[in-house]
């Protein structure tokens, strides 16, 4: 029987099983199936997926993320904050500002430390990708997808689509408590107009610096939080004139709050907590 040590961590309730690949060895061919198994709340550990903290040739660490359905994702805002916390607290980095490699590129992390423990992490998520081909999405001739008509099962909606290294589509709602997360979410996630699938966000605008947010994540379903989704929601809200550029926006997620800023320089900055839940050994 094989085994590996793990740390379970969460960012605003978005939990993953973190594996230190500097110390552990898991066959590449088993990563997808193991992500499914460890995520299972009944027969595994229970999580939204599995994240590997790996050696990198271009940064102190590299993050690989596997969703609970076994698919490999390119980016994860909540995961990045937890990787930053783990890397700093385990001595993988000494500076409080450092880079993390992801499948969608390098991102910069800055940790806030109190008594040797990381309490908050700010991630520079880079520039949003706004071209239809970058999301990607099939549809109208317009280069950007902003307040675009979108029909699902005979009903008309308006959507805005943004990539933060992974694809997001935003629906605005009047009341976040009645948002059709579990009904519309899974349909849109696999809509053929999004050839790589899509994360589906529902946003209620409170004012010009505050949003309520719920998400149906590609490959995971309903989660307590989605960092890249919160970033995409703020970018979409600026594009639609609902919030302001270069101004902090508080995004209220099911698991807590993130502070997001789309700077005048073009990058999106995300600040929020990261917490360790437990450590253990998984047998397979």
Swiss-Prot record:
Pfam families xrefs: DAP_epimerase
Location of this chain's protein in the cell: Cytoplasm
Biological pathway: Amino-acid biosynthesis; L-lysine biosynthesis via DAP pathway; DL-2,6-diaminopimelate from LL-2,6-diaminopimelate: step 1/1
Gene3D superfamilies: Diaminopimelate Epimerase, Chain A, domain 1 (3.10.310.10)
Annotated GO MF terms: diaminopimelate epimerase activity
GO cellular component, one term: cytosol
GO terms of biological process kind: lysine biosynthetic process via diaminopimelate
Family: Belongs to the diaminopimelate epimerase family.
UniProt xrefs under NCBIfam families: DapF (TIGR00652)
Biological function: Catalyzes the stereoinversion of LL-2,6-diaminopimelate (L,L-DAP) to meso-diaminopimelate (meso-DAP), a precursor of L-lysine and an essential component of the bacterial peptidoglycan.
Name of this protein: Diaminopimelate epimerase
Gene behind the chain: dapF
